[in-house]
């Protein structure tokens, strides 16, 4: 079966510093019209908005936004791939662009309620009670949430701009922004790509990075740090203001968010090195090697903060957050640096590494992990077809 046509990511516009893209889909149509007049194409925001305005005029197969073939961008001068991107490199970048938009969408929701709403990351007005529960994990959580959101916006914007500069189709998932928003005060009432209100969070990353003898690349299955999170469906943001009334329930929501932050960013930490092994051109490799480590920085930050989640039982659903320091080094909270473990072959000495980094089916593995997380609950069959098509194309890429 032929893969669905790749689509193009677009971000939304708010008057702001010219170098920061914005994510406000509720105002997108009006802002796109304004952006066509005089915005500088070197701006991340204006570049993507112009692409949106053009792409909207050229609906492709299945109703997905496609860029017209004419002059997607002026040819790169030096440093870039001569003759354009290889099919495989373009497929990898398109999948990563889609992944970054998905990340942007979920981080935007967290920022609206518990981050800092400003000109860099506008949207929403905050939920003081939820933000206070989040701050139990660290007093600077609002700044970290804001900055993680801004980083993901920049990743999506850059990758799409690079694709366009080399005559390849950028990606746009806007037609799939149909999932409901939180009804809690502070959240924008706009369509979303992701669902943060019915999550099933895999916390095996916690024990994976603390093990000195196991590695998923060898087929090892690591235990859950918070077993309950992987065994049900739980909100990581308040669904409505009713979720703010019971203190332990609200803290459980904040704790869930803390571990979800880790889950999302450990995925990116592995995905970039996994796909880097499949690229052909040195500059595309440079992109993956430059963005990937920022995901690792996010992951380590959130690992430190999640360790501060207070042990408790949610009185509304029985979700238990255990004392992670009660069972030894496998879950000890201050062990946030990757424990040396087996790599490549067991005959070699153990070494501190990112894991997994096996490249086979890496993109589809990421899609499956996010789906199992509950992040796409409520999404359409077409959405899954598009995302899996992008993943298959990325996984089919071959180096050289």
What residue spans do the PLM features occupy?
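N-terminal secretory signal peptides
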Residues: 1-42, 70
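All-alpha RGS (Regulator of G-protein Signaling) helical domain and cognate RGS-like helical scaffolds
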Residues: 33-35, 52-56, 65, 69-400
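Membrane-interfacial loop-to-transmembrane-helix junctions in polytopic alpha-helical membrane proteins
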Residues: 41-44, 86
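N-terminal export leaders
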Residues: 43-59
